[in-house]
Structure formats: structure tokens, C-alpha cells
């Protein structure tokens, strides 16, 4: 299985309609598509590690969820509780969004063409920024003391990825 990430900005009037459109694209393209709130993603490495872990869980038969998209959210959030992991999904309003598209090369290409119509592409929404700092610290229970010991706020993405590694090791 291959995957690609599409990132950008969207205005979501109705979450149900947005998710229905994504499900329709996934079904017609024969791909798995997971929409993610980009403000809860530390950086590209965070998303890559979560996707690799989720794919590995399915390969090894150690997956928690029966749906690959939900398994990606579980690993992304470093949390075993599906309800909490779903908080990494999209919400109503103006949002920075990521799509993880998993499938064959052809199914990914078809999906990306259609998903591009739903957003204004902007790959920078994946990158760590000071604007994400508070959200990430709260979401992953990272303390100021921990940040100081790690060497500063610019190390938050590393602390987030550490949470992912621990989640994968002890799930």
C-alpha cells in the first residue's frame, strides 16, 4: 500500500456533507481517505510515523480499529480511545486540513484530483509553527517542564513523536 498527503485550507459549512463527499471520493477511487485537523499534527514526520504504524498494525493484525482511517487517527493521537482520536478529525468552519490517502498509485491519483477541489492546497499547514504550540501541548499533555528539559518549544514535534512511539510499543 502507498499513501499520499494533501494539505490545505477549507471552509466546512456542514461536517456531515464534507465527510460524505470524502466517502464518495474514497468509494469511487477505491482508496482509504482520512481527513484530519492539521492544527493537531506536529509536522510531516508526525503524520508519516502515524500512517506507518497504522499500516503496520493492520499488517500484523494488531489493529485496534476495523477501519484504516480510524486506526490512523488512533496512532496520530497516540490514544487507544476511538472517541478521543476522532477529535483529530475535521470540524465546522475555516480549517487547516490534511487528507491521508491510502491505496494504489492509480487510486491515490484519482482521489487527489477530486480532493483538490475541496480545499485550497497549502502544504505549509503540515509544518510546526508557534500557532500550533498550545494545541499540541494540550492535546499530548506536554508540560513546560518537559519542554524545558527537551531544549525548548521548537522540540515539541519530537515530544509528540515520542508519544507515538510509546503508544505503538505499549498498545
Predicted regions, residues:
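Ordered, amphipathic secondary-structure segments that act as subunit-interaction surfaces
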Residues: 48-104
Amino acid at each position: 500500500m502507498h499513501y499520499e498527503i494533501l494539505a490545505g485550507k477549507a471552509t466546512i459549512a456542514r461536517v456531515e456533507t464534507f465527510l460524505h463527499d470524502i466517502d464518495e471520493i474514497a468509494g469511487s477511487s477505491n482508496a482509504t481517505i482520512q481527513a484530519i485537523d492539521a492544527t493537531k499534527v506536529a509536522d510531516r514526520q508526525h503524520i508519516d510515523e502515524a500512517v506507518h504504524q497504522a499500516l503496520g498494525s493492520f499488517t500484523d493484525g494488531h489493529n485496534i480499529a476495523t477501519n484504516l482511517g480510524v486506526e490512523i487517527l488512533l496512532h496520530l493521537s497516540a490514544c487507544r480511545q476511538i472517541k478521543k482520536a476522532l477529535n483529530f478529525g475535521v470540524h465546522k468552519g475555516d480549517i487547516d486540513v490534511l487528507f491521508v490517502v491510502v491505496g494504489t498509485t492509480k487510486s491515490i491519483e484519482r482521489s487527489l484530483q477530486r480532493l483538490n477541489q475541496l480545499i485550497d492546497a497549502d502544504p505549509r499547514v503540515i509544518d510546526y509553527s508557534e500557532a500550533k504550540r498550545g494545541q499540541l501541548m494540550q492535546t499530548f499533555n506536554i508540560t513546560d517542564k518537559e519542554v524545558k528539559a527537551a531544549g525548548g518549544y521548537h522540540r515539541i514535534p519530537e515530544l509528540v513523536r515520542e508519544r507515538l512511539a510509546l503508544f505503538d510499543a505499549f498498545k
